Amino acid sequence: MILQLKDGNVKIELYPDVAPNHVERIKTLANNGEYDNVVFHRVIDGFMAQTGDVKFGNSSKDDFNLSRSGMGGSSMPDLKQEFNNLPHERGTLSMARSSDPNSANSQFFI
C-alpha cells in the first residue's frame, strides 16, 4: 500500500496474518477514498505522526476545522483489539485508540 503525501510517497507494509481486521479496515477506507485529503493532526517531531480522522480531518471539506481533527473516526464500528508481539520500531504503523483497547477505528500513527 502506498500513502501519497505532498512531499513524497510512503510505502506501507500491512500484516493481515497478525491483525486481519485492522488491515481490512485500513484497506477498505483507503480503497473508498476516505483517507484522501485527511491531515496529520498530531505530529511529534522525531517520534510520531498521527492521521486518519476521516470524520473531522478532511481538509477539502467546507466544514474542516483543524482543532476538531483527531476527535473522530469512520462510520464503521470500532474494532476489537488485535494486540501482537511485533515491536514498535521506527516506521511502524499502528492503529490509534483511546484508553479502551477495543476503540480503534480509522486513525493510525507512524
Annotate each PLM feature.
Residues 1-110:
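Cyclophilin-like peptidyl-prolyl cis-trans isomerases
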